[in-house]
């Protein structure tokens, strides 16, 4: 079974129909890039999957857990159960969303330590559990090249470093799928490369990812599959070679040609 299944997802804001019946699947270890013009519905897909927005209708399944079923959308879900499901996915935002009052290590471990408090043996093993979270966080920070910045605060970091902290924060929770919402859009061009390098290394480790991006060459290099969104629908879907080198849709050709000039 696919690790992510989205069926006929629809979402409107007021009278504006943003998603008009989006369906796709993703297998474990795959990297999906979602491309398209601003306003085409890319970010709304991510927000609906991550339960930051409630879809109007459709179906979302993550790791064999029903995240949304339009036929039962009015049914109240237990808050603890909803939180448990949300931890199956990680979302890296455009604008970092780090806590300025906490240092790098604290930012990375805060959510994991709050989650750990729900463990039945937390009180008896608090020190050991928190120590293990710190160890895991340091290991991940080493992978993203920030081990020497553990005690630094966000204001002391470059934009690229802050984004790498936010990636580490998501990874420490061990999500089944990691989502990126235009992770380089808030960065200067010279800092973009360091983030793309981290994402590429995650792809090589077979981390399952969904990436909304405007970086076409990167999407082509790192993706298992690519979706081109246009006006709330999937205009084209396929391998990077199919979508970028041999697009079937005139609209896809038109969009990609703007990045080749």
Question: Model-flagged regions — what are they?
Answer:
Residues 153-157, 161:
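Conserved ABC ATPase signature
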Residues 237-238:
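ABC ATPase "signature
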Residues 178-181:
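Catalytic Walker B motif of ABC-type/P-loop ATPase nucleotide-binding domains
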Residues 172-176:
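A short, proline-enriched helix->beta-strand linker immediately N-terminal to the Walker B motif
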